Regions:
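Hydrophobic alpha-helical transmembrane segments of membrane proteins
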Residues: 1-74, 93-456
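Short helix-to-coil transition segments within interhelical loops
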Residues: 79-88
Length: 456
């Protein structure tokens, strides 16, 4: 048996706890039966479905994230990282072992719900929805643990605020669909719901199960790679690139006109741009990281350069490749492009805008200080992208695109066919200025870093 899984079972399970859970659930079932004796089967199904969601999604998610936080706060995470377990063994051992007691109660609730649904209508549909809820919950746990490991700073004793925010986002995004899936009226027909996925026209339950399985696969991939990073197992960022493309492919299936042409490439580009910001603000991009990249580029094989490279350039390069493919597959003539004027120009502007924002982030990240650059970056983007253009637009509307190139979209609303020259010239000016500032920051901090290294 997996040693990490066995250790978590030893911590979570005991004969007393194993006996308490079914006893409490039996009392809850008795209460539900007493409150609604006319239709006890439906009441039991609804009540224990809600309990299933509460135990697995709510309590189980807290246990999964706490399994990492407790290791860090109790100073045992370093011992975990020195174990002989592979990243995959450590990952699934923690994933299923830390929430084993919550899953014990959740599976008991699911069993009661299935028995209560035996004599009801569309029994198999209810079972499929419960399966969707279980698979989606495991996917949620995998994504939560992966995000916590991705943002983990072992030098800090306090839990990461970013991890807490990611936990809230994932919990909200996953809990609501799971509740909908489990409590959906089984007497209603299995409609298409969100629309046919990739034009297959599957029933909503089967479609949701397929999407949940895909998200689970991507979550396990992210968890395995994040655990490998914490265990100091070097790897090239192929898993990140595959995850970004896989998530974009899942989303592209719900597009109004899904296909392997322009709609797919546009969705992949948007997903890659979003992941660029995610990697930028959750990873360390300080001077030491880029010094390691430059060192390996000069003295090591290419593989070591890829291993040391942060993830945001990978996402940005993926977005650029997808935009090139979008342009080559007649993206400007697609149905979506006809509905949104100058969509191709807006996408290229978004690509350059993302590169500019990454440069602003690095201007603050390359400082010789321990202060995190996130707050100053967001403040700069707000002032540069909202406050100053809004002030200038009231007096001189033509100057607003020079401060925020996306203000050139106003020309599209007025019937123009493109963003206008001022928007593109403004973006070019931004890139030149930001590149100069980053180069100055790098050269200004290099002597200080060199002196501190020699002193050590």
């Amino acid at each position: 048996m997996n040693p990490e899984f066995k250790r978590n079972l030893w911590l979570e399970m005991s004969s007393t706890r194993l006996a308490i859970m079914p006893g409490v659930l039996a009392l809850i079932g008795l209460l539900v039966y007493v409150l609604n004796p006319d239709d006890p089967q439906r009441s039991l199904f609804v009540a224990f479905s809600v309990l299933f969601v509460g135990l697995t999604v709510g309590w189980g998610s807290l246990l999964v994230v706490s399994s990492i936080n407790n290791e860090v706060s109790e100073r045992t995470w370093d011992q975990q990282r020195l174990s002989a377990l592979s990243p995959w063994d450590m990952a699934w051992g923690k994933l299923f072992g830390s929430a084993a007691y919550a899953w014990y109660g959740g599976l008991l609730c699911a069993l009661v719900a299935v028995v209560a649904a035996l004599s009801g209508p569309v029994f198999w549909s209810r079972c499929v929805w419960l399966l969707v809820g279980a698979v989606g919950t495991v996917a949620l746990h995998a994504w939560l643990m992966a995000s916590r490991l991705h943002t983990l700073d072992i030098r800090s004793e306090k839990a990461s605020g970013m991890a807490g925010r990611l936990f809230g986002v994932f919990l909200v995004l996953q809990t609501l669909p799971v509740i909908f899936m489990v409590l959906r009226d089984p007497s209603s027909p299995d409609r298409e719901g969100l629309g046919s996925w990739w034009g297959w026209g599957l029933p909503l339950s089967i479609q949701s199960l397929l999407v949940a399985l895909l998200l689970l696969a991507l979550g396990l991939l992210a968890l395995w790679r994040s655990m490998g990073k914490q265990l100091m197992v070097r790897g090239v960022p192929w898993a990140w690139a595959l995850g970004v493309l896989g998530l974009g492919w899942v989303i592209a299936g719900f597009m109004p006109a899904p296909g392997w042409g322009a709609p797919l490439w546009m969705t992949l580009a948007c997903t890659a741009l979003a992941s660029t910001y995610g990697a930028l603000f959750t990873e360390s991009n300080n001077r030491l990281v880029w010094q390691a990249v430059l060192y390996h580029r000069a003295y090591s094989p290419v593989r070591r350069v890829w291993q040391a490279l942060p993830l945001w350039p990978v996402s940005w390069a993926l977005a650029a490749v997808c935009l090139v493919a979008y342009s080559l597959t007649e993206g400007a003539a697609s149905e979506t492009a006809r509905e949104v004027p100058a969509l191709q120009g807006l996408m290229w502007m978004a690509l350059l805008h993302t590169l500019r924002d990454c440069g602003i982030y690095h201007f603050f990240a390359l400082r010789n200080t321990n202060r995190k650059p996130t707050a100053m970056t967001l403040l700069t983007l707000f002032v540069l992208g909202v406050v100053l253009p809004a002030l200038v637009a009231s007096a001189a509307p033509g100057l607003a695109p020079w401060l925020e190139p996306f203000f050139g979209a106003k020309a599209l609303a007025m019937g123009e066919a493109s963003l206008g020259a001022s928007a593109w010239l403004g973006m070019a000016l931004h890139l030149v200025v930001v590149a100069g500032l980053v180069a100055w920051r790098w050269s200004a901090g290099a002597p200080v870093a060199l002196r501190s290294t020699r002193a050590d």
